[in-house]
Design a protein with these regions (language model features):
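Residues on a specific face of well-ordered alpha-helices
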Residues: 118, 136-139
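Active-site nucleophile and cofactor-binding loops and adjacent substrate-binding regions
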Residues: 130-136
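Anionic-ligand binding region
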Residues: 141-143
Length: 143
């Protein structure tokens, strides 16, 4: 990283359980500012539920990157995987880019985002980041 360029920003964006109209205004505005938007897809699925939660919305002109992951209860395997993922985003952050990461439901509730932000902060303790809450499926059902 060069000293003249500040480190980019990482944002976790909870997109809610779907449909798209359950995305918060603050999260939508942040999504518009992202240079790169990453979205998770379980290897056991053909498409990303988090990305589908945005169906019907006019998506921002940004670079989009699918992140595939396996569901695993092996903590060592998860830690290694998310550290590798964090390292793969290193170049984007060192270029000063704003990187968004979509999560289905809420970013901090049973989400891949929690693992990724932990790994990123191990690499960059000074990383500027923000987490945008999303509506969980159980909160949506209760409403």
């Amino acid at each position: 990283m060069t000293e003249s360029r500040p480190l980019g920003r990482f944002v976790g964006i909870g997109v809610g359980p779907g449909p798209a109209r359950l995305l918060s205004v603050a999260a939508w505005e942040e999504l518009q500012r992202c240079d790169l938007i990453c979205y998770p897809r379980a290897t056991s699925h053909e498409s990303s539920a988090a990305l589908h939660a945005l169906d019907g919305l006019e998506l921002p002109q940004a670079e989009w990157r699918e992140i595939s992951f396996e569901m695993s209860s092996d903590r060592d395997r998860l830690r290694k995987y998310y550290m590798e993922l964090a390292l793969s985003l290193r170049g984007e952050l060192e270029l000063g880019r704003r990187v968004g990461y979509l999560t289905l439901g809420d970013s901090m509730t049973y989400s891949t985002y929690g693992y990724l932000i932990t790994a990123l902060r191990e690499i960059y303790p000074q990383l500027r980041h923000r987490t945008y809450a999303g509506i969980t499926s159980f909160a949506a059902i209760a409403a």
